[in-house]
Amino acid sequence: MKPNLKEIARQGVRIVSNAGGVNPQACANALRAVIAELGLNLKVACVLGDDMISQRDQIAGHGYKEMFSGEDFPAVDKVASINAYLGAFPVARALQKGADIVVTGRCVDSAVTLGACINAFGWGRDDLDQLAMGSLAGHILECGPQATGGNFTDWELSNNLENIGYPIAAIKPDGSFVCSKPEGTGGLVSVGTIAEQMVYEIGDPQAYILPDVVCDFSKVTLTEIGENLVEVKGATGLAAPDSYKVCSTYADQFRGGTTMSFYGFDADKKAKKLAAAIFTASRRTLKMVGLPDYTETSVELIGAESQYGVNAAVANCRELSMKIAVKHSDPAGIGILLKECVGLGLATPPGLSGFAGARPKPSPVVRLFSFALPKGSLKIQIEMDGTYIDCPDTLGAALKRELIERPQALSAPLDSNMVHVPLIKLALARSGDKGNKANVGIIARQPEFLPYIYAALNEQAVAERFAHFLPEGATQQSLSYVERYLMPGTHAINFLIHDVLGGGGMASIRNDAQGKGFGQLMLDASIPVSAAIAAEVNA
């Protein structure tokens, strides 16, 4: 901020950021010190109340269950953080009180944008459609250049990445907005880039739950109105929920691993042989020193298409990177494996190589425990110039999913002569994580392609495609592991896949612990379409 503060003051730009992390007060105070050093007159406000770590004993005693798995609250001495996801109204209140810069701790990412909208347009808590649109604008903006050509299926169209432009949303009082990027910057803004970001990291698109509103994105429309200009309309809102999502992190075991490369004939077979030897030697040492076996092991051969499972198409692999990793209750168990990885370095099949510095070290497995906290339980405040302003919240209402009117399922096409084409010719895709779940959003390139995609990609087909990442037996219970949602406004389907990330995030020892590449795996699917469509997309 320091290099930009003078220009911020000169132009009267107001800044809202959730950069406060676990200590927003310290961040705000540091900003004030820099502002004073520069002799500027800027007011900094700080949103407080998300941090609940001081209440961990009471929370543990309350008996909260993990909101997805039903697990009990972790041991108190293992808990590192407890933070509630706050909403946008405290941000708006700070702006209304004259703050030039608003710093928050944990809040939903879209709240920084929605808070600015509430302040600018005077939206109230009952303006649900506007709140949903403002939240969608925030959702589009929150991952920066992922809305302007980053992580984009048609990546060849996104150029000058070293100077990629960050997204801009010009929002109107009714909530509709136009996405763009600064002139002269790289990347692009198109219906495709905005659609992909809209489906990123969402679950049920008709019940995208935020503290201030439950959003329905299923009828959103995207219209290209000029070069790098996309108009967004159509999100609607339901009443705010009656609880906050609270995330606690806690230490649970240890993890560690390393990567090494093989090249030459049968590189995949050589890597598998070495991995087996490392595990055998490590387990022998574990037994000698009286330690239990590893609680989880992972070997991934990046280059031999291990991420594709039964759909792998590489034969006679000649070059790959092997990632080997484990979990153990004792860091010494991790150290044993890391030592064996080095010790067996001269005993391997030929072609081993690698680029690395110091030997990796064991690190804690940090797991996430999420639970629903009834509204009214938090003391939310704004601190500005040493004054504390209370921001009481309304209690909200319980979401009744069974009352949501769902789009009509698409009828399967009846073409007699079907031709198989890869999904990537018919659709765009974007995937991401939701804890130990992953979502994969599929956006048809043309509306007429969607019925064919919908017919081919049912819950069973998706479970089978990701079977190597799912718990054993999941393909026999596909409806328990895969949810499928239609989004007619953008001719899209969103899939939510449960228990597919090996714990997700820091709890996982997968190479892709956040499902970032799952969309690419889906785009490889073969979809039967009419001969006319096949001719069109293959032209």
Report residues per predicted region:
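Conserved phosphate/anionic-ligand binding catalytic regions in large, soluble enzymes, centered on
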Residues: 18-23, 99-116, 428-448
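Helix-rich interaction surfaces within compact, conserved domain-sized segments
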Residues: 476-539
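C-terminal non-catalytic interaction/assembly regions of soluble proteins
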Residues: 233-420, 434, 443-450, 455, ...
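Catalytic or ion-translocation cores adjacent to nucleophile or general acid/base/metal-coordination motifs
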Residues: 36-54, 114-159, 455, 464
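Short, Gly/Pro- and small/polar-rich lid/capping loops
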Residues: 201, 205-228, 397-427
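A conserved active-site cap/scaffold subdomain adjacent to cofactor or substrate pockets
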Residues: 131-238, 255
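An acidic, phosphate/nucleotide-engaging active-site surface
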Residues: 53-104
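Hydrophobic or amphipathic alpha-helical targeting/insertion segments
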Residues: 13-16, 21-44
